[in-house]
């Protein structure tokens, strides 16, 4: 199989690296013509409304503006990002199908699943990383907790469900760790992404969730209250909300 010539490959890598996205593509790149010569597809392993989707759409707009080719965002949520990853891994290795997902789900799936429909080492090539930021811990107004400490006390005496945006994701691990260290019985409820998770927090079906500020902000005026942020420092967007550290 012919490999892509150095100049088009360099153009592609420069475009992706400059935008700082978490992007992967099929491992073998066989396109020999100038890139891009046709529309590009970005597969997002989560539904619309979350941070990963927002990054993909911003990235798509920038690529279109730079190269004049249409860039389509294709949301393929489900199975902890396996569906989206598989769609890209089995696409033609021509540089026109990209994957946008979270690094956590990519690597943790190797541990969670005994068999995957793709080989991460052979079928995909990492291209770039996007910057990460603190996550927001939010509860519905009917939960009386104002801090994580108060929430843990609440969870010890009340049935508690916690939303996660994928099995094995960071929120899933937090729930498991709190159960182990504090004796709670928080039940993790897995969603196909952040957007539907936060909607269920707002409706009161979930007692707590952890996710990006961008997705949390869509329900912040609909009865969801932040009680903490991850990371070492407070978020400039939520300066009155304490960190979990």
Residue ranges, per PLM feature:
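Extracytoplasmic "Venus flytrap"
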Residues: 42-55, 77-79, 163-170
């Amino acid at each position: 199989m012919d490999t892509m010539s150095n100049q088009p490959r360099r153009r592609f890598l420069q475009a992706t690296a400059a935008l700082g996205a978490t992007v992967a593509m099929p491992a073998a790149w066989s396109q020999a013509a100038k890139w891009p010569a046709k529309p590009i597809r970005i597969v997002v392993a989560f539904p619309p409304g979350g941070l990963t989707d927002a990054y993909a759409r911003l990235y798509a707009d920038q690529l279109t503006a730079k190269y004049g080719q249409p860039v389509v965002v294709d949301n393929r949520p489900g199975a902890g990002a396996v569906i989206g990853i598989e769609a890209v891994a089995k696409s033609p290795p021509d540089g026109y199908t990209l994957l946008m997902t979270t690094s956590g789900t990519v690597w943790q799936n190797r541990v969670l699943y005994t068999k995957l429909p793709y080989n991460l080492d052979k079928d995909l090539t990492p291209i770039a990383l996007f910057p990460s930021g603190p996550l927001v811990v939010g509860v519905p107004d009917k939960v009386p907790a104002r801090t994580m400490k108060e929430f843990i006390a609440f969870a010890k005496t009340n049935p508690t469900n916690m939303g996660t945006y994928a099995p094995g994701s960071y929120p899933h691990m937090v729930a498991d760790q709190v159960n182990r260290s504090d004796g709670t019985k928080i039940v993790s409820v897995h969603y196909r992404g952040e957007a539907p998770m936060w909607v269920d927090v707002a409706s009161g079906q979930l007692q707590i969730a952890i996710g990006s500020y961008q997705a949390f902000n869509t329900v912040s005026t609909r009865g969801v209250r932040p009680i903490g942020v991850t990371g070492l420092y407070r978020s400039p967007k939520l300066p009155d909300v304490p960190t979990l550290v």
